Amino acid sequence: MKFYQSLKIKKKIIVIFWHNRLLMTSFCWNYENNFRMLISSHRDGQIISNAVSHLGIGTIQGSSSKNKMSSLKEILKSLKDSNVVGITPDGPRGPREKIKDGIISLIRKTDATVIPLSYSAKFKIQINSWDKFIFVTPFNKFVAVWGNAVEYNKNKKPEENLKVIENELKRVTKLSENLAK
């Protein structure tokens, strides 16, 4: 599996997942590399940060709109130290399931491999928020799908690279939805 091979050879890895599916992402992580999530410093981000810390996942405070340089430095340091960094490329404010172009700048700066992750469940609750945040109910069929590793292609335009990444994340999201039925 390309993802597992990337971990074994200590490549820089950024795992991306939609903002509405970040809650259960921590349960999908089962590798020896440390995992750190970029999480908003807002109150709701702090709740998530506290929850994932109990599962052994570190956090990087920041977002695409605040503390950009501080969080970028922390991401660069984490990747250099062989941590895997998790990012919601449509967060913290959307639009829902639309990747912002900041991820392209990040992978160009870091030369990281991007690996999409999505999940779904047979029974779930979607709350009425900008992202239609998903809560998975207990005692349920849960499916997580890891996508193909995507590397930045220097022969393509940045927006073409972004489309490749977004399409792969959408593919694994749709696949997880279908498998969870």
Where are these regions (language model features)?
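Catalytic core of membrane glycerolipid acyltransferases/transacylases, capturing the structured
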Residues: K12-K66, T110, Q126
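A short acidic, often aromatic-flanked loop/helix-cap motif at beta-alpha or helix-coil junctions
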Residues: K2-Q5, G45, K66-M69, V150-K156
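Membrane-anchoring hydrophobic helices of lipid-metabolizing enzymes
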Residues: M1-M24, C28, I57, K141, ...
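Non-catalytic C-terminal accessory region of glycerolipid acyltransferases
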Residues: N30-N33, S70-K181
